[in-house]
Structure formats: structure tokens, C-alpha cells
UniProtKB/Swiss-Prot annotation:
Pfam families: AAA_2, ClpB_D2-small, zf-C4_ClpX
Protein name from the UniProt record: ATP-dependent Clp protease ATP-binding subunit ClpX
Keywords: ATP-binding, Chaperone, Metal-binding, Nucleotide-binding, Zinc
The species this protein was found in: Staphylococcus carnosus (strain TM300)
GO biological process: cell division; proteolysis involved in protein catabolic process
Record gene name: clpX
Keyword Oxidoreductase: no
Lineage: Bacteria, Bacillati, Bacillota, Bacilli, Bacillales
Amino acid sequence: MFKFNEDEEKLKCSFCGKDQDQVKKLVAGSGVYICNECIELCSEIVEEELAQTATEEFTDLPTPKEIMDQLNNYVIGQDKAKKSLSVAVYNHYKRIQQLGPKDNEVELQKSNVALIGPTGSGKTLLAQTLAKTLNVPFAIADATSLTEAGYVGEDVENILLRLIQAADFDIDKAEKGIIYVDEIDKIARKSENTSITRDVSGEGVQQALLKILEGTTASVPPQGGRKHPNQEFIQIDTTNILFILGGAFDGIDEVIKRRLGEKVIGFASNEAAKYDESALLEHIRPEDLQSYGLIPEFIGRIPIVANLETLDIAALKNILTQPKNALVKQYKKMLELDHVELEFTEEALTAIAEKAIERKTGARGLRSIIEESLIEIMYDIPSSDDVAKVVITDNTINNEANPELYDAEGNEVNLEKTSA
């Protein structure tokens, strides 16, 4: 009769050697077994290594001064805003550095940032440059396209999808990225009094943004659009995502002025009408944002508020010429590819800046002004071998004269005669 051999029949964990009677569970693989105790141990090791990897990503975190230096390469002026952003971003990623498997006595909370300033003052460029400096995923969203759940428009989760896409669907990277939400002032409540009518693009959106600003595990539809039953979702933790909220907040200077009792600090009372809007923004307080239409809970999620100044002629001229990717440098390089030298006179730069101020477009409108003046030249030059140099004057910018064209010997060239 066949005799049962217990020693041969008992299954053992291939890692620790314990048999099936000594553990709660054995999981079978291809010729191997692993017990529940080894599974738990492996899980702990993986979690610790992942946490260590997350902190190592920012071991070379630049200091606030180094961040400021990088911002100076691309953004002219706005020193106060750049300093506030540099410190805020440094503290944010330093906070991520200290996160790990061990519990800390003091929990450092996230500090999102609000940038308040007129159109074309550099809000978006600041956020973009920060992300580039830190080499983290970056996404831009427009608050005006958002509506609260259940209404036509974008859900707030679609903002997170853009960040996930920017990180090539690497969730770990996305969870340490930066999201810039523009036009945040456009979702302000229409008045301080709660209305009985629905404000689906105002207070409702603020309420929807609250959780992702503070930190939550959000369910994001991988294809975007509205959520629906039986749909698969991407899970992303927003706790370590830095949100930078930007807006022009037109008219908030009047709100501040009313709070200050029609008297601007640092100015004589009879000069109240001649106040500097930028000086007023320096005195902005949370109650001003609430009076403008942001709900208190939303304001509480953006403890850092930096104001950007209106750009004057001198600042706009510097923007045209000084940054690494300055517009004048770009257009010079563009014509250089056609073996043509491009020159802007000092008066031309002043005229460009003046026109941008007149149009109230700030730095954002500089490119279109230059493009208007160069479009004909950029059309003709590739077909002409005579032009070696183009000079743009203030008369060119003001549409009073054509650009001055010269050949290699310095003689003036008339393209109309040449083509004839």
C-alpha cells in the first residue's frame, strides 16, 4: 500500500523557507511560492524605496536666489513677485523633500500662490519659467472654461489631466508638478451676497477647486470630458502639486481704495486721485479678494499673494531686448537665416512700447506689433538677393514709412523697383 510522505507534500515559501503550516497564506507562482509575511515585507521595502526616490528627485533643489537668477534670464522687472515666487517654490519642494516613510512631528502644509497683475505683466511666463527651472511637469488651464459638475463645460479634473499628459502619464512626476490656472478672477462671485440663482462658472467652480487645491486623491477620466458610470479613472494625489493662480482682477484697486478710506497709504489726501495702481496692490488683503468675489474657503487655499506691476515704457523696451529669448533677438535670428541683418532704432523700440501701452496689452502684445511692421519684409526678402540690411524706425512702427533697406555696400534698396 502507498505510504503518504508528509515532508515531501508540504509546500514551503521559496523566500523564507517556512512551510504552509507556519504561515497564513502561500501564493503560488511558476514553480515558486511566497508567503503572506514575505509579501508584507516586500511591500514595506518597495514603499520605503519609492518614498526615498521621491525625496532624491529634489536633492539638488536650487536656492531662492538661484531660482530668482533663472527668472531674471526670462522675466524683466517684477522683482517683488519673483522674490515671493522663488521663496514659495523653494519652500514647497523643500517640503516634499522632507516627506518620507517616517512620521514627522511637524507637518508642513502646502502654500499655493496667487499672482495678481494686469494683462501682459508676465504672470504666465513666470509660472512657465519656474517649471522649466525645476524640471517638473507644467500645465496651463483657463478658469473661464470650467463649470461645476453637472453643467456644460469642463470639469476641474480636466486640469489634472493636462498635467498628467505633460508628464507623459507618469503619475509620480505629475504629482510633483505645477499647474497655472489663468483668469482666476473671472470665477469670482458676481456679488458678496449669495444669490438664489446658480452661478455655474463662479462660486460653483471655486467650490469644485477647493479639494484639489488643498490636496485630495482625484479621479481623472483618461480621455478627458465628463465623468460617466462604468468609466475607468486615473487616480492622482494633488497634495504635492503646486497651484499658481493668476488674474488681472480689474477693479480691485477700487476695492482696496474703499477699504483704505479713499486715502492711499504714503500719499497725501489731496493726491488720492493720482494714486498708482501698483502701489495700491501692495496693500491687498484677503478681505479685498473676498469683496471682489472669492469665497473665504478659496482664499484660505492661496496664502501667498504676489502682485505684478503695470509695465512702463522702460520695462517694455528691456523686455524687447534683454531676456535670453527676447523678441528683438528672435527676429534678428529669423532674418539672419536669410543672410539679412535686422536693426531696430532706439526710437523704434520706444514706439513699440508706446503702442503696447496704448493697446493695454502689456508684453503680450509686443510680438503682434513687430509682426505687423515686418510682415511685408519677411514676405519679400526670401525672393530678393539685393537686401543685406533692414532698419526699423519709429516711422515704420507707426505705419508712416516702410522699413529702410540696404544692400551689402550700404546703398539704399527699393524692392518695388527691383521687382519691376
